[in-house]
Design a protein with these regions (language model features):
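Outer-membrane beta-barrel proteins
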Residues: 46-50
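Extracytoplasmic and endomembrane cell-envelope/extracellular-matrix remodeling and assembly machinery
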Residues: 19, 24-28, 35, 39, ...
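Substrate-binding/active-site groove segments that recognize
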Residues: 1-26, 37-45
Length: 141
């Protein structure tokens, strides 16, 4: 029997995500190997986009779910929607209803999604930030 307790790796996998994406006690932990971890991360994000959707209101939910877990995001979103009917099903509804959500979700997820978008902006425009790199979208394998 094995047990992971904390998220690890460059791409922040918790144990259950790692197992879902191919990590197991019989293999070296792929969560700490860059290429397998990146592939697993992309696969997991694709699954989350399949669950939450690819529209402009849905992608931030999928990103937030990557950080907090599908259950954590879904339960907090439901709390926010239950407290104010008529609000859109989006990340900004979570922000607007933060006082009704778990403290852990507020502390981590409220920062994670904006940081994700900030990293994407820097990754696509590295020269604007003084980085001598090509935009991330120009790299291929």
């Amino acid at each position: 029997m094995f047990q992971f307790t904390f998220a690890t790796a460059k791409l922040h996998f918790v144990p259950s995500d790692g197992v879902i994406q191919g990590s197991s006690p019989s293999k070296p932990d792929i969560r700490c190997q860059p290429e397998p971890s990146a592939r697993a991360s992309a696969s997991y994000m694709k699954a989350l986009l399949g669950r939450f959707g690819t529209g402009p209101a849905s992608v931030p939910l999928a990103i937030g779910s990557y950080n907090s877990g599908e259950g954590g995001l879904s339960s907090n979103l439901q709390k926010a929607l239950d407290s104010n009917s008529g609000l859109p099903r989006d990340f900004w509804t979570l922000i607007a209803n933060g006082d009704k959500l778990s403290k852990q979700f507020q502390a981590e997820n409220f920062k994670y999604v904006p940081k994700f978008f900030a990293a994407a902006i820097v990754g696509e425009n590295p020269q604007d930030f003084g980085l001598n790199l090509q935009p991330i979208s120009t790299y291929s394998k």
